[in-house]
């Protein structure tokens, strides 16, 4: 079909703003559960630290985080505050791949999707007093799901990302 596809990649908060300004027809984002998407799947998260250069035992705990208003940042900081652990930002990036690599190489502890776990990571959890965070999903939004081209693209994304129709 004759379609122009413009792809925008960015932090969830930036994509949401573009969606609200009606600059996007289709949006695939990670989000906390809440707003009902066209299709979605749970996004399991893991607390990750470096296996070779563990950081969780440090005081303050160095953290690997998205920038302000980035995903998982609030969950990480609130959890450590609740545990009475002091922390500092060891590395910040808007890139999921960069965060995963930085954590694996010992720059700090992070909370990322399970799919970002690298062989150089160790998974943290109950033994460290860290809770399971299961409140996020990968969500697909479509402005006009009954429009043929948008529907075709949405169906392709549902298949590609292993989403489930809502």
Where are these regions (language model features)?
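Secondary-structure junction motif
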Residues: 55, 62-83, 150-151
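Flexible hinge/capping segments at coil-to-helix
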Residues: 35-68
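A late-sequence structural motif
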Residues: 129-166
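Central regulatory/effector-binding core of bacterial HTH transcription factors
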Residues: 1-32
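Hydrophobic hinge/microswitch elements
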Residues: 11-12, 71, 77, 83-131
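Ligand-binding "clamshell"
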Residues: 23, 33-48, 119-129
